[in-house]
Amino acid sequence: MTNKEIIKRLYHEIIPYKIPLFIAMFAMIVVAALTGAQAYLVKDLLDKIFMEKDVFFLQILPLIIIAIFFTKGVLYYTYAIILERVGQSIIRDFRLKIFAHIHRQSLSFFHNTPTGTLISRVLSDVALMQQAVSTVIIQLLRDFFQVIFLLGVIFYMNWKLALICFLIIPLAAIPIVKFGKIFRKLSTKTQEETAEVSNMLHETISGSRIVKAFCREDYEVERFHRQVETLFTITMKNAKYRVFQSPLMEIIGGFAVAGIIWVGGSEVINGSATPGTFFAFLTAMITAYDPVKRVSQVNSTIQQGLASAQRVFAILDIKPEIEDKPEATSLAPFKESIEFHDVSFSYGTEKILSHINLKVPAGEALAIVGPSGGGKTTLTNLIPRFIDLQEGSITIDGTDIRDVTTNSLRNQIAMVTQQTILFNDTIRNNIAYGKDSCTEEEIRRAAKAAHALTFIEELPNGFDTALGEGGAKLSGGQRQRISIARALLADAPILILDEATSALDTESEREVQKALENLMQNRTTFVIAHRLSTIKNASRIVVVKKGKIVEEGSHEELLKLEGEYQLLYNMQ
């Protein structure tokens, strides 16, 4: 993506704020005009007061200066606060947009994109964009108008000397353009390494138990040291180029001032210019050169912002793999059956499911068993469209799930998985997460049905207990029962249980199993289980091996077949 394309897209984000921007730009123009007037007043200060001894002008000049500075101060505050608000609003919009876009992606997006990278895009990259947007809107626009008015003053006073000033601009532009390309490249590398640091932090902190279990603290510290050392090296390289610009611009400016003093001083000596005109010109030129120098100083910030914007837009340009059709309708309440019609699915070239045909009547508890990697979880992930099938179709009451909105589909499905996901919030809010609005009584009923009410009430803060990240303050069985309470409160007619008890000890499993039995009542349930003892009472059991259903029947029927199910059963 070129700079022009990035700027064009950023421009479209700014358009909604055009009215406050116009107000701020008007204030900037007035401030710039007053800055030009300040420079011009140096001429009258020297010529009329010091040379001509004009007493009247001496009396009114201080009042004029006070009026100019007061007006500039008021207008500066006006445009600065407006532009700060606009800049922050644009960044807020970007954060909301990228956050919403990320959550519209399918599961494969999260499998392929490291968490630290996504965090870096939302926080670090957008923050750098904010700096660039604020710099461009506030500083560059202000400096642009200031330079225009000061150049007008310069040409008005002495066009010959003004031409010398114009020789500076091409010289000053060379390092700005040259270093701009370097900054862009280094900024991209810096943000890539920053994302790697974020990834490493996320992995090691979330996996702290494994790090400690294998005594790998020193190893991880050394690995992190290497990563931050790489980031340090790139950052310092960026800093060297950035800092080098300032003295370079000072040297160029020094030559320009020396030339103007030599030419302008000669004109004063031979009488073709007054001292006031010369010093006013010099003041205007030095004042105008400051914004030119600032362009070189902020060039690094702008290039970092453009590189960050490119990465943010790259995320925003990723189309979700699963989107509602334009003509998609809401799924009617589930009543009859869920059917798989010749369903196949592959990850790349690897076939995971092959020609699955299955009908699950409403109210049935279907257990899905089989060796690891056989396709059990993939089969259930197709129902809520976490992934999309590639061949065949899945229908609910005869309606293809691809013809309905994903929200209406998922609203009729509840899940309890082996990996219990709880948020760093209170127990109450974690249970209520499954329903937009619910009463305290509904939350308590769900907790009671999930066999969680007793231990919740024993906690010092009860339902207001903060769980910590991932529910770290609870045991595995307690976390799972909170998850079951959440599913109960959602009251969805379709239930998916994916290894819901496999990570629990016997006592915890017993409590969770009771809660699951309550949850499964009057629901159509898909149960994935390795512990076959937990699914003996299932209405039907299907054995999935290498992506195919190889056996189907009740527990007793499958044992009589003396096939795959019996092998699995005997292994336990």
From Swiss-Prot:
One of its GO terms (cellular component) is plasma membrane. GO terms for molecular function: ABC-type oligopeptide transporter activity; ATP binding; ATP hydrolysis activity; ATPase-coupled lipid transmembrane transporter activity. Residues 338-571 form the ABC transporter domain. Keywords: ATP-binding, Cell inner membrane, Cell membrane, Lipid transport, Membrane, Nucleotide-binding, Translocase, Transmembrane, Transmembrane helix, Transport. The keyword Membrane applies. The chain crosses the membrane at residues 14-34, 55-75, 148-168, 249-269, 272-292. InterPro entries: AAA+_ATPase, ABC1_TM_dom, ABC1_TM_sf, ABC_transporter-like_ATP-bd, ABC_transporter-like_CS, ABC_transpr_lipidA, P-loop_NTPase, Type_1_exporter. Its main location: membrane. It is a multi-pass membrane protein. The keyword Transmembrane helix applies. PROSITE patterns: ABC_TM1F (PS50929), ABC_TRANSPORTER_1 (PS00211), ABC_TRANSPORTER_2 (PS50893), MSBA (PS51239). It catalyses: ATP + H2O + lipid A-core oligosaccharideSide 1 = ADP + phosphate + lipid A-core oligosaccharideSide 2. Its EC number is 7.5.2.6. ATP binds at G370, P371, S372, G373, G374, G375, K376, T377. Residues 22-304 form the ABC transmembrane type-1 domain. Pfam families: ABC_membrane, ABC_tran. Homodimer. In MsbA the ATP-binding domain (NBD) and the transmembrane domain (TMD) are fused. Involved in lipopolysaccharide (LPS) biosynthesis. Translocates lipid A-core from the inner to the outer leaflet of the inner membrane. Transmembrane domains (TMD) form a pore in the inner membrane and the ATP-binding domain (NBD) is responsible for energy generation. This is ATP-dependent lipid A-core flippase. It comes from Desulfotalea psychrophila (strain LSv54 / DSM 12343).
